[in-house]
């Protein structure tokens, strides 16, 4: 089980990213628009740089919903390989069968 502080930090980042997403998108659109004057694009770059780092989507870590494990998490069901194996051995994952040959 992951540290609760790490899980909470990631949850705060998710919330901050969700709140700041429209503003970040607006500023990035201004920066990418070559028809705007250079001064306006530069001002948008400075405003984007002033925003908190944790409001960026790249700072979010994919974590297992059950254990909080940060590595080897499947995006499809947001579970780590270990959690999938445990649930599968108990028969709780539909369609998952232990392989044998």
Swiss-Prot record:
Intrachain disulfide bonds: none
Cellular component terms per the entry's GO annotation: cytoplasm; small ribosomal subunit
GO biological process: translation
Entry-linked InterPro entries: Ribosomal_uS14, Ribosomal_uS14_bac/plastid
Gene Ontology terms, MF aspect: rRNA binding; structural constituent of ribosome
Region entry Disordered, spans: 1-23
Residue stretches of biased makeup (Basic and acidic residues): 1-10
UniProt biased composition (Basic residues): 11-23
Keyword Ribosomal protein on entry: yes
Keywords, comma-separated and alphabetical: Ribonucleoprotein, Ribosomal protein, RNA-binding, rRNA-binding
Record's keyword annotation contains Ribosomal protein: yes
Family: Belongs to the universal ribosomal protein uS14 family.
PANTHER family: 30S RIBOSOMAL PROTEIN S14, SMALL RIBOSOMAL SUBUNIT PROTEIN US14M
Main function: Binds 16S rRNA, required for the assembly of 30S particles and may also be responsible for determining the conformation of the 16S rRNA at the A site.
Assembly and binders: Part of the 30S ribosomal subunit. Contacts proteins S3 and S10.
Name assigned to this protein: Small ribosomal subunit protein uS14
Gene name, Swiss-Prot/TrEMBL: rpsN
């Amino acid at each position: 089980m992951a540290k609760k502080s790490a899980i909470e930090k990631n949850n705060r980042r998710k919330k901050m990213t969700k709140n700041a997403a429209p503003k970040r998108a607006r500023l990035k659109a201004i920066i990418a628009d070559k028809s705007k004057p250079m001064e306006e694009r530069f001002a948008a770059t400075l405003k984007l740089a002033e925003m908190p780092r944790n409001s960026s989507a790249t700072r979010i870590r994919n974590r297992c919903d059950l254990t909080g494990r940060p590595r080897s998490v499947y995006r499809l069901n947001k579970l780590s390989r270990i959690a999938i194996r445990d649930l599968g051995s108990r028969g709780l994952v539909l369609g998952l069968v232990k392989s044998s040959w």
